């Protein structure tokens, strides 16, 4: 558990920052999400074992991960010689792929650059390996489920108790170890009355 908390610190931070940026940039979705959270929680804090799963919050998290995957590059070692787009690739070589670009590929995603949490409603799924914010296959991130539960609990509680307004819209993606917002996501935070 401690390993997942420490290893996931930067990725969780990036996910939360990008989610607040997207919600601040899309006030109509933010308002719907606030209503969803308030209806689901009332005055009770969210709990991991309470069965609390507001669908819109889950869709917002998935869409944030699609548009701004904290780990934006993946890699795999080639196990046997192959040809890829006319180029010979030898066994043992390492191939890198862009999760960021895959998640924005119009061949897989309608309106690929738009923030549209509804694309995940009704159990809709992307084609295999078109949505891989935690990698895919046997080498997928062991903390994927934990990270999503953590995000749901943190976002649920913050949205339950505070109002957020985006203070600075001029944010760009910086591709470092994680995909981080630069110069950062600045929000005006107001405690909700009665909280």
Q: What residue spans do the PLM features occupy?
A:
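Conserved cytochrome P450 K-helix/beta-meander segment immediately N-terminal to the heme-binding cysteine loop
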Residues: 97-124
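Conserved cytochrome P450 K-helix E-x-x-R motif and the immediately C-terminal K′/meander segment
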Residues: 44-85
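Conserved cytochrome P450 catalytic core segment spanning the I/J/K helices
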Residues: 1-15, 54, 116
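Cytochrome P450 catalytic-core helices
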Residues: 11-36, 144-160
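Cytochrome P450 proximal C-terminal region
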Residues: 38-40, 140, 145-195
